[in-house]
């Protein structure tokens, strides 16, 4: 890859979510970003696919009347051809453990990109139980954005995607007690 990366950005919380906007702004500092995200909340839809989707222009790119996997397919097929990386998030709520493969729209978008042979990063924000469902602010995603931006800047060149189809990042809320980083396979 020469120059700044081309980034297809999606999520499952919808194109108007604070997490997507925060990631868009952070990633725009290091690359060319095109958002192709659901027009409305599509949380917990897994890898569901639609037979047809409507696509609307949006100030960040495109709003798709469909699932996160639909967004990746539409993006890779027509709206953001040949990106260097697909980023999905920043999700409101962690995506940890094996069960997320079947449920999480955020992780499923990264999996869909991997099926197309495109490196992908799924990014989520851990929320304590009492905050879940209450929404998040733009600023609460700053650590998730920082980690994801770092990975987009550096991971593509390291060869990590020769061994991993996608990365699943889960960041704490700002101000939470730091925990040790764990890399799992």
PLM features: residue spans?
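Glycine- and Gly-Pro-enriched alpha-helical subdomains that act as flexible
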Residues: 122, 134, 148-151
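Electrostatically charged, flexible surface regions
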Residues: 139-185
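A cross-family phosphate/adenosyl-ligand binding-site feature
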Residues: 2, 7, 17, 21-82
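Internal, conserved structured core segments that host functional sites
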Residues: 84-131
